[in-house]
Amino acid sequence: HGIGRRQRQMCIRDSIDSQALISEMPEVIEAQAQIEKLQKTYQTEIEASMKEYQTKLQTYSADAQNQTEVTNQARQKELQGMEQNIQQYQQTAAQDIQQKQADLLRPLIEKARAAIQKVAREQGFDYVIDATPGGALILSDGKDLLADVKKELGF
């Protein structure tokens, strides 16, 4: 009985840095490349819009004294609209990139976790500690103690 307990303790000490594993997966590297490409595309479009905005701002500012009040107000409104459009586009881009990351990486993270569990099971481990900073236990086939602990506490 003491040997079984000692073996369990040894099994719990085995660990893996899941973050390192995931970051080295070829599919993850490919997904990251797709995400970076999308980020660059959005960045280029945002920079072009910002440049257009800056150019108009300079042109309108330099020409403001030669224009009527109505024209200057219309130009101011146009610039405000451009500013709002750029901000909205930046938000949309950030959300789109975040969604793309989730869509591409979630199945790969699940694939890595399943592989860790499979290897742990094959090697007879109940639990594997995730050595990633802030990582947790990765459950393989360990016993859930909830019912036993509830019984011990009398409920």
Where are these regions (language model features)?
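Conserved, well-folded catalytic cores of nucleic-acid-processing
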Residues: V119, E152-F155
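Solvent-exposed coil/turn segments that connect beta secondary-structure elements
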Residues: S18-A20, E27, Q84, T132-G134, ...
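Extended, charged amphipathic interaction segments
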Residues: I116-D141
